[in-house]
Amino acid sequence: MSEQLSLEYLFKDRPPAATPADYDMLCVKVGGAELYGELMWPDGNYKKDRPCVILCHGYPGVARNDDLAFALRRIGCVVLTPHHRGAWGSQGTYLISNCVEDAVYLYNYVQSSSFREKYHIDPCAVFLIGHSMGGNSVLQAARKVKGLRGLVLLAPYDPTRFLRDRNEAPLRTLLETGFILHSDGIGAILEDIKRHLEDYAFEDAYPDIKDLNICCFTATLDTIAPPWMVKPLWSRLTAHKTETVQRLVELPSAHGFCNSRITLIRETALFLDAVLSRPMPTADGASL
């Protein structure tokens, strides 16, 4: 087991500490717009440098996965739950590509010396987690950043899949649920996806993430991001020999995993623990 996590508190309250666990507003400026969210950290009894999780919401962001965020905080993680630009009070315009840029920015933000020192972050233990369209956000961000320790995809949604199949209707139906978002309309979001049609195709991410620690959750009753949506990518990952931790977890749930929350939280924590229990690989494949 990792020395940085206390899995026994995954579903149990922590004892009192001189400096209790707490939270604050997340406020950063990305692309000239203020992005808001929540930042939470564990109690002071966690003495070692802490793992950090950036948890990205989907489209339009109703499902926040707060239960997962609180559970990961209890076992020792610093957790950021941002609202993407144009979503839920954050400034700016909502676009799929902006969500990817937000995730990249936040990863670099938590790696800054000021953030690391203030929240006692282990820079070698940063994870990206994303649900639905947030799965695309973190998957594409993982291709762009250096030193990411692991990636968790929760029913990841490939925004290019239906367009590449020349079947725009299901995507348009999903986008119509985003009336709460500040955007230039469905047409603008669609055009943004079309501009990144080849960039964001899930299976094309393979060369960039094939040796990354990854845990992917699919829901067998999911009609929004069915398991087949990630299958081309996962088939390539399965055929590739790697020393990293790569797990596919199939749950008997619909898109929000509403009847499998305990299992989802437990398996996510076990994945983080398995990754952190291993030495951090260096650029040449050796271990620290």
Positions of the model-derived regions?
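Conserved alpha/beta-hydrolase "acid-adjacent" motif
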Residues: 223-229
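Hydrolase active-site cap/lid region
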Residues: 140-189
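The serine-hydrolase catalytic nucleophile loop
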Residues: 58-71, 228
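N-terminal cap/lid segment of alpha/beta-hydrolase-fold proteins
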Residues: 2-46
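Short beta-strand/loop motif that positions the catalytic acidic residue
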Residues: 209, 216-218, 222
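Alpha/beta-hydrolase active-site loop
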Residues: 94-120
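C-terminal catalytic histidine-bearing segment of alpha/beta-hydrolase fold enzymes
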Residues: 231-234, 238-288
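Conserved alpha/beta-hydrolase
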Residues: 69-91
